[in-house]
Amino acid sequence: MFHRFRIGQAAATIVSDGPLVLPVAAKVFQGPDAAALNGALSATGQRTDAVDVQQNCLLIDTGGKRVLFDNGMGSSKLYGPDSGQLPASLAQAGVDPASIDALVLTHAHSDHCWGTMGDDGTPNFPNATIYIAQSELEFWESNPPGQRRERSVAGVKKHLSPLHDRITFIRDGEAFLPGIQAIDTPGHTPGHMVFLFDGDWCLTGDVAFHDPLSYAFPEAESVFDVDPRQGVETRRRLLDRLVTDRLRVIGYHHPWPGLGRVERAGRTYRFVPGDE
């Protein structure tokens, strides 16, 4: 599955790695009561016995470079049987993985980087330079304690550590590829990055990962955040910027294809889908 659009003058495509199924909202979002969370889901036609999200990977051709942002779950079915669709989506869009020059990672959680290596130990994107924050890679390679973190540590050792010679570290504020700037947004993970594009677009990664819950309850802490309090601070700061600067949004986990704008809704926010 793919969706073509434009980011400024650049050709862009959203390519799907398929849906994920997360636990019930009250187990993912801490703070609001279950009734409030479920009410927001029901109001947008979503079920309440689980949290459904997409994996919308951005592919953009800019400055003579073909760039892919994040790459899904690979062959893992950790969050449901229907992930792992990225290779088929790229093929449907007519994109050879070998033609991808750069692989940019918002962060190193399973659903963003486990498509980097094949099960046979060879890179799925054999000609791509990998861009990631140094603090992100170093955190996961330091073996941080915690049961939930063990999977991410193992994933980084499989998918990123063998490719150190292909990795380029990116810094806050750096325009590291033509028309693309990295912005440090820690909390979800220590080295989480979002990306600004010429043409007033922002790829937001997992700072506000769910529509509508991340917008209706920006103060809710996420069980997936390494530093939940910092995650809330970063989310509020980014959402304010998205509204103030009128930036269009590429939401990795938002309903397909994840494109739209953010508006204020009283003291909270709402996501408004659309390419324009």
What is each PLM-predicted segment?
Residues 2-92, 194-207:
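Conserved beta-strand hairpin/beta-sheet module of binuclear metal-dependent hydrolase folds
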Residues 17-19, 71-74, 108, 135-136, ...:
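Active-site metal-binding loops of divalent metal-dependent hydrolases
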Residues 79-80, 114-124, 261-262:
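Metal-dependent catalytic neighborhoods of phosphoester/phosphodiester hydrolases
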Residues 80, 198-200, 204-276:
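Cap/insert and terminal regions of metallo-dependent hydrolase folds
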Residues 84-95, 99-111, 126-184, 230-246:
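Metallo-beta-lactamase
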